[in-house]
UniProtKB/Swiss-Prot annotation:
The keyword Transmembrane applies. It comes from Homo sapiens. Induction: Induced by low-level blue light (453nm) during epithelial wound healing. Induced by ultraviolet A light in dermal fibroblasts. Residues 1-40, 103-117, 178-201, 280-287 are extracellular. The chain crosses the membrane at residues 41-65, 78-102, 118-137, 154-177, 202-229, 256-279, 288-312. Disulfide bonds join 114-188. The modification N6-(retinylidene)lysine is found at residue 299. InterPro entries: GPCR_opsins, GPCR_Rhodpsn, GPCR_Rhodpsn_7TM, Retinal_BS. Keywords: Cell membrane, Chromophore, Cytoplasm, Disulfide bond, G-protein coupled receptor, Glycoprotein, Lipoprotein, Membrane, Palmitate, Photoreceptor protein, Receptor, Retinal protein, Sensory transduction, Transducer, Transmembrane, Transmembrane helix. This is Opsin-3. Expressed in tracheal airway smooth muscle (at protein level). Expressed throughout the epidermis and dermis, predominantly in the basal layer on the facial and abdominal skin (at protein level). Expressed in dermal fibroblasts (at protein level). Expressed in melanocytes (at protein level). Expressed in keratinocytes. Expressed in the retina. The keyword Transferase does not apply.
Amino acid sequence: MYSGNRSGGHGYWDGGGAAGAEGPAPAGTLSPAPLFSPGTYERLALLLGSIGLLGVGNNLLVLVLYYKFQRLRTPTHLLLVNISLSDLLVSLFGVTFTFVSCLRNGWVWDTVGCVWDGFSGSLFGIVSIATLTVLAYERYIRVVHARVINFSWAWRAITYIWLYSLAWAGAPLLGWNRYILDVHGLGCTVDWKSKDANDSSFVLFLFLGCLVVPLGVIAHCYGHILYSIRMLRCVEDLQTIQVIKILKYEKKLAKMCFLMIFTFLVCWMPYIVICFLVVNGHGHLVTPTISIVSYLFAKSNTVYNPVIYVFMIRKFRRSLLQLLCLRLLRCQRPAKDLPAAGSEMQIRPIVMSQKDGDRPKKKVTFNSSSIIFIITSDESLSVDDSDKTNGSKVDVIQVRPL
């Protein structure tokens, strides 16, 4: 329970949630008194309203761009759209409940509202981290194992992501832990404090299944991706203009994915730290002010991903500029200046085999998402002088779009 000066938000929480040990109750008992001053509630409402509007606008824009422009419809972008859909739903449902409560100086919803707020927040948060994990794995099997990813694979992955997230978010609805009012009194979350074996086991497995394992998979995948790119750059026979472009593309894509993961962790880390404190019996250190700040950081993650897409993916940037010209400025670039939908190619595996009198043969596989380069050693095929680099003989380079 919270104790201390409720009007100023000073005091502490014992980690059991504002609802106490009895779980969610009718609205009147969930938040018996305001935890912040009226001015603080107004500022919180302004911040949450801004986060909600930006989250809805930015993520809705990503969905519109994906729908309108054929060039954006790739399996990788479909995974990015899944994150945007999750963030859009967070902005519509999760932020709205807290925003209205700020306007009313406290939680105004009943038990069902509390359960829905906790369930939706958990569901969409797990969807985001699970999609980032699948995105890392997708890059891993394309780059390291040189396998092609199609839409069927992407749709199956998204289906499993939502089923996996529903299982974890729905467990408290079936009696494995529960959703209670958070310490700041403006939203609901899992009961982190409970020492009951049933509740504690859920918290333990939730940390493992939705934090430790995903981060481990992400670290493993990107470690191998960076190693593969580094090995490819060390092979002198592949230092052609085309391959250099591929390396730049992959490096940029790796930076984008890393930035998305880094942003997610930065936004959610304060909340995760608070949960660890509560689980380990240090809930008295968590004040309502600290709790609401961590909540704002977590919800702000819904705003950043679309900005990352636009700034780091040229296809999104071109599509956005074209949409603005067509819809807002009423000026359309000449057709010859606009890239035709589907005209851009995707990079697939590079398989390289070299011949050099005294050196052993090397085989390098590399995968990307824009063009397929296959460098083979078929003696029946001829090769241009431009395909020979550094005194080595490369028999043929085949390039074909996906």
